[in-house]
Amino acid sequence: MSELGVFGLTIPEKYGGLGLEKKAMCIVSEELSRGWIGVGSLGTRSEIAAELILIGGSEAQKEKYLNKIASGEIFPTAVFSEPDIGSDLAHLKTRGKLVDNKYLINGNKTWITHGARADLMTLLVRTNNELTDHKGLSMFLAEKPRETEDEFFPAKGMSGGEINVIGYRGMKEFDIGFDNFEVPSENLLGEEEGKGFVHL
């Protein structure tokens, strides 16, 4: 799929993509899903991450990640939804606290598509505890290792399990827990706190 350009359809050519319109992504995803819906979902993960990086990322972040996403070297996933919050992202509870040059992430996420397979998480957390609405949120480009034969989440500070679904073979969903999971400060999208909801 990466050789066909599926993961970089709308990424600009200067970052290794094909530079096509959103319509192309929709058509390709629909056609792949017609054969196997789980495969059709793969390109959309890359689409979400690339869009966030293009909209809000620094030039250094664009250069670091977009080429690798377009080539399929990096497989990203969106880590937004939470238990009891669902898609009401303005009120999410997962926290990120800056300590020295890294953020410590604590909290829980759910319904994370391809969570164990991914190398990179677009991770939405609350970095300002004094704000309880969308203004206190920040987006991170959080790197992690892929699953192993023994563990879904071998990274220090991560745990979780698969959510069994009916009828959507191949598109695996996960619960993820963070316990002082470390993200370098330079992986804050756009290198500015409080812009997470704007990026969405």
Which stretches of residues belong to each language-model region?
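A structural signal for short hydrophobic beta-strand segments in well-ordered beta-sheet cores
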Residues: 94-96
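Short Gly/Pro-enriched turn/cap motifs at secondary-structure boundaries
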Residues: 42, 69, 84-87, 111-114, ...
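A short core secondary-structure module
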Residues: 102, 106-157
